[in-house]
A protein has these predicted regions:
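Loop-to-transmembrane helix entry/capping segments in MFS-fold secondary transporters
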Residues: 50-51, 152-162, 300, 382-394
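C-terminal transmembrane helical hairpin of 12-TM major facilitator-type secondary transporters
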Residues: 330-373
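Loop-to-transmembrane helix entry
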Residues: 49-59, 196, 287-311, 422
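Helix-to-loop junctions at the C-terminal end of transmembrane segments
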Residues: 66-83, 316-329, 413
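Intracellular loop-helix junctions on the cytosolic face of multi-pass helical membrane proteins
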Residues: 1-16, 109, 114-129, 135-138, ...
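Helix-loop boundary and gating motifs at the non-cytosolic
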Residues: 5-63, 258, 262, 266-290
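Intracellular juxtamembrane helix-capping segments at the cytosolic ends
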Residues: 137-150, 369-383
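C-terminal ends and interior cores of transmembrane alpha-helices
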Residues: 91-117, 339-351
Length: 447
């Protein structure tokens, strides 16, 4: 930007544009929810040792830890108008590979590699790793485009739409296996083979991912480098220099680290929910411990329904949080996380299938806050310089806690006598620590 260029500030966008910026997130969240809600079931069906599940659940956050900052940094320097612009080319690439892996992953048990064989589990782990890398590549552009294109007055609305579409995608994905079972699709299969209810769910999710992603790519027009610089009050060259991650982290606003502390405990809890909730529900409600049993598969389906309940609660609570005044962000954040802590911990005690609905409503309240407040608090404190890199680096506050939780599970799970319900009680304790950590946040805004 030269002396003759006037800082314009980001313009107000039509609501239809904001919806299109976020629309592809629906498909991405369907892919992620299918993965997180069915991964434990898939790998135990393939013959994975329950005490070693933590290794498989390290892969998603490990992918995000590397991929999202890299995509942020690379896209800050990218301008490819024929492929969509700055962020959208990475959405296209990620979507293509994610779809391939979604078609492959649930069929691994049908390749004749053998129940519990090293080949089957390694093949599955590689497929999960590629799916995670590609899904993370496709996900990050949506977060960055809001920072790039949406002004401060509309930003909370934009993130609210993203949260709503995210949770709507989770609802759709979570209901797929349950609905297909009702429609007569087989929910059990021979030993080592993933049931057709899960396989078809992944197929449908892949189709939706393609449609929603292409709608965003074709309908959204990113700002060219000159316009972006003028709107953000920076020079065109600013995003092409001084982008070393460690240097940027040293300059990160204090709230970046304060929110990251809260994220540590939030995602510790959520990692154990993804890893152990199906087994905990199977043990407490169905008294089932064999992953091949009908009871265990019913628990897997019910966990999918509960995940949908969580997402519906999150959609409703997100609307409530949008009405919370800016000076009460911390109150809304802390109370929401405390509700979630009760939800996690209650799974340890509850033996009733229907009573678990209340647990997941509380978890959904926490989930809404986890999707709303962190990005709002951090992006409000950032300038337009290296926006993608900073938001990618902030994603590490999601990934690192999950890696830590997975590694710690190799000690904690045996210590708790391999009790999956006890792991959910641990998640509840971590949720309480997350709520307490909110007290240390001091909200700031960019100049």
């Amino acid at each position: 930007m030269n002396e003759n260029d006037k800082v314009a500030g980001l313009p107000e966008l039509a609501k239809s544009v904001i919806w299109m910026i976020n629309f592809g997130y629906l498909g991405i969240q369907i892919a992620f929810t299918l993965e997180t809600s069915q991964m434990s079931r898939i790998f135990q069906t393939l013959g994975a040792d329950p005490t070693k599940l933590g290794w498989f659940f390290i892969l998603p956050p490990l992918a995000g830890l590397v991929v999202q900052p890299a995509i942020g940094s690379l896209s800050d320097k990218t301008w490819a108008p024929k492929l969509g612009g700055r962020r959208l080319p990475y959405l296209l690439i990620g979507m293509i590979f994610a779809v391939i892996m979604m078609l492959l992953l649930p069929n691994i048990g049908s390749f004749g590699l053998g129940y519990g064989s090293v080949e089957a589990l390694v093949f599955g782990a590689i497929a999960i790793a590629i799916l995670d890398v590609s899904a993370n590549m496709a996900m990050q552009p949506f977060k960055m485009m809001i920072g790039d294109m949406v002004n401060d007055e509309q930003k909370s609305y934009a993130y609210g739409i993203q949260s709503m579409l995210s949770n709507s995608g989770a609802v759709i994905a979570a209901f797929f296996p349950f609905l297909l079972t009702i429609l007569g699709v087989a929910n059990t299969a021979k030993k080592g083979v993933v049931p057709q209810s899960v396989v078809i769910s992944f197929y449908v999710g892949a189709v939706i991912l393609v449609i929603t992603s292409l709608l965003t790519v074709t309908k959204v027009h990113e700002y060219d480098p000159k316009t972006y610089a003028r709107y953000h009050g920076i020079n065109e060259e600013d995003n092409k220099k001084d982008g070393i991650w460690f240097v940027l982290l040293k300059k990160a606003p204090k709230v970046f680290w304060e929110v990251s502390l809260v994220q540590l405990f939030c995602w510790f809890s959520f990692q154990y929910l993804s890893t152990y909730a199906t087994g905990a529900i199977a043990a407490n409600v169905w008294k089932a411990f064999d992953p091949a049993s009908a009871g265990y598969q019913l628990a897997g389906n019910w966990f999918g329904v509960l995940t949908a309940v969580q997402s519906i609660a999150a959609v409703i609570w997100s609307y409530i949080l949008a009405k919370v005044p800016n000076n009460h962000h911390k109150l809304g954040y802390g109370i929401s996380l405390l509700f979630g802590a009760v939800g996690y911990g209650s799974i340890f005690f509850i033996k009733s299938q229907n009573l678990l609905i209340l647990s997941f409503v509380l978890i959904g309240i926490s989930w809404a806050a986890m999707n709303t407040y962190p990005l709002t608090l951090v992006s409000n404190a950032l300038s337009g310089k290296h926006m993608g890199t900073y938001l990618g680096l902030f994603n590490c506050s999601i990934c690192l806690p999950q890696i830590i939780a997975s590694l710690l599970s190799f000690i904690l799970f045996p210590f708790l006598k391999c009790s999956m319900p006890a792991m959910m009680l641990t998640a509840g304790i971590s949720g309480i620590l997350a709520a307490i950590s909110v007290l240390f946040i001091k909200e700031t805004y960019r100049n």
